[in-house]
Amino acid sequence: GLFRMKISRRSVLRYSGLAAAWLALTGCTPTGNASLGSSLPAWMQKVLRVSPADSSAASSAASSEASSEMAASSLPASEQLDPGFSVMPNYDANPLTGEERSGNDRIVGVMVNNICNSERQNARPQRGIASADLLIESKVEGGITRFCAVYSSVDNIPEIGPIRSGRDQFLQLLMPWNALYYHDGESIFCTQFINVYNYSGLNIGGKSYFNTPVHPHVAHRIKRSENVAYEHTEFTSAKEIKQAANDAGISLSSPYEGTFFRFADYRTKAVNTLEGTPAAKSISITHSASYKTSFAYNSWNKNYKMSMYSNRTKKFESTVDELTGKQLAFDNVVVCFANIAAYAGDSHDVQEVQY
């Protein structure tokens, strides 16, 4: 029902005094608080139905009264603020890691080759993937898998590669973040996604883009051995990606709100736990008969160490970043289940992932 109360002038004075004191505690003035509209007197006139003169006088008198009353009496020790009390800053997390953000850089996703079928058809060990904030692996075609190394800032990208052509299952995960998608070539289905969703302005690496007179400095070649095929020898870096973005008129700054996953709050040092679930000490993922990925939990370092099956050596091998010489390790591993099959009518076995 309707709540009614009688407010006397004395009540108005005390109410005004409390309001003024509260505003003072929050660093606001009675006449300049935006959340009250224009001013405290006007707000009181509307809510308490007092005249401007009454409300102004009430505010002035009450402020004086509140000050004297506050000075005359102190809170009990149990009710006083902790000397270490501080206001929690606004939540501003890195969208990929959940850690405190240090800038407003655009997310960059780089396609990385992962073929390992023979001495000639071999992209391992890759470079730069250990520095990625997020490493996505998905089956593409012919049973092979490919990586998309995702970085929260172009400045975090070392030399990376071998780079390879784009696929729509990776693009679909990057598009909601207006990320720069960097690759060499793309499937016809990836091109269709780019055209339908008008994403060409954030896509670098369409067919015939790399190593052309128009864009000569967006990647480089490294001859890894006499046996490795030419298509597995292309690399790039932060400097080259910046050059390509500049050539294309793409800004590498972009403000973000929200995060890729629902992270624990970095401000409180909280930890997300899945109560009542078994501990995942090992994880095994089979993409195809020749492409399998496994993770083993290291309780000492509290991370998951990554290994992949090699169709070249016919055994599992540690996944190593060639730049560091160390096995890849992750704090979190997320396994996504989705229907995946070749696009209908496609003769190249390009895979459609139904997210």
Across the structure, where does each feature detected by a protein language model lie?
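N-terminal secretory signal peptides
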Residues: G1-S11, Y15-T26
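Polar/charged alpha-helical tracts
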Residues: R4, S11, S38-K46, A53, ...
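Short, flexible coil/linker elements and helix-boundary hinge sites characteristic
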Residues: G27, L40-P41, Q45-P52, G249, ...
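Post-signal peptide N-terminal segment of mature Sec-exported envelope proteins
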Residues: G37-A77
